[in-house]
Amino acid sequence: MNLRLELTRFLSLGYVLSSSFMFWMGLSLFTDCHSPIVVVLSGSMEPAFQRGDILFLWNRNEKNNVGDVVVYEVAGKSIPIVHRVLKQHYDRSTGEQLLLTKGDNNNGDDVPLYARGNYYLNKTKDVVGTVKGYIPQLGYVTIWISENKYAKFGLLGLLALSSLISSED
């Protein structure tokens, strides 16, 4: 075992991980979204977006218009929701924009999904971003890995095996 070679591999791995992290943080700053890329997890927005589509978000617009597709998070729930703005108005006391959303494939609006006692989303507090682009079906890989525990272990095993194979000279 060559210590210098092992340290070089370790540093290369650290470089790749830190570069990936910095890219994600830079993208987050550029788009003003803590999660600038999300995967559609349900069919509530069909036919516009299918389960497994990857969405690219932008949160630098001052307001959202009726018809915009937004991603929002509700306090106490960890999964972001992708739905279309159905109505919008402004709070008279604060001047903040309030939004009512609905999934294209749903029968009713999203009020039952909002935090208890809220009938609208607050644009600045609840909305993660507005959808500006997408790649169809590419997100199925992440859905498959997250829903299949064997896939997680298999992927980790493949990574470990590849590092063992590549370390043998």
Swiss-Prot record:
Residues 30-169 are lumenal. The active site is at S44 (charge relay system), H83 (charge relay system), D110 (charge relay system). One of its GO terms (biological process) is signal peptide processing. It is found in: Endoplasmic reticulum membrane. GO terms for cellular component: signal peptidase complex. Residues 154-165 are annotated as: C-terminal short (CTS) helix. The chain crosses the membrane at residues 10-29. InterPro entries: LexA/Signal_pep-like_sf (IPR036286), Pept_S26A_signal_pept_1_Ser-AS (IPR019756), Peptidase_S26 (IPR019533), Peptidase_S26B (IPR001733). Its EC number is 3.4.21.89. It catalyses: Cleavage of hydrophobic, N-terminal signal or leader sequences from secreted and periplasmic proteins. GO terms for molecular function: serine-type endopeptidase activity. Residues 1-9 are cytoplasmic. Its main location: endoplasmic reticulum. It is a single-pass type II membrane protein. Keywords: Endoplasmic reticulum, Glycoprotein, Hydrolase, Membrane, Protease, Signal-anchor, Transmembrane, Transmembrane helix. Glycans are attached at N122. Component of the signal peptidase complex (SPC) composed of a catalytic subunit SEC11 and three accessory subunits SPC1, SPC2 and SPC3. The complex induces a local thinning of the ER membrane which is used to measure the length of the signal peptide (SP) h-region of protein substrates. This ensures the selectivity of the complex towards h-regions shorter than 18-20 amino acids. SPC associates with the translocon complex. The C-terminal short (CTS) helix is essential for catalytic activity. It may be accommodated as a transmembrane helix in the thinned membrane environment of the complex, similarly to the signal peptide in the complex substrates. Catalytic component of the signal peptidase complex (SPC) which catalyzes the cleavage of N-terminal signal sequences from nascent proteins as they are translocated into the lumen of the endoplasmic reticulum. Specifically cleaves N-terminal signal peptides that contain a hydrophobic alpha-helix (h-region) shorter than 18-20 amino acids. NCBIfam families: sigpep_I_arch (TIGR02228). Belongs to the peptidase S26B family. This is Signal peptidase complex catalytic subunit SEC11. It comes from Kluyveromyces lactis (strain ATCC 8585 / CBS 2359 / DSM 70799 / NBRC 1267 / NRRL Y-1140 / WM37). The lineage of its organism: Eukaryota, Fungi, Dikarya, Ascomycota, Saccharomycotina. The gene is SEC11.
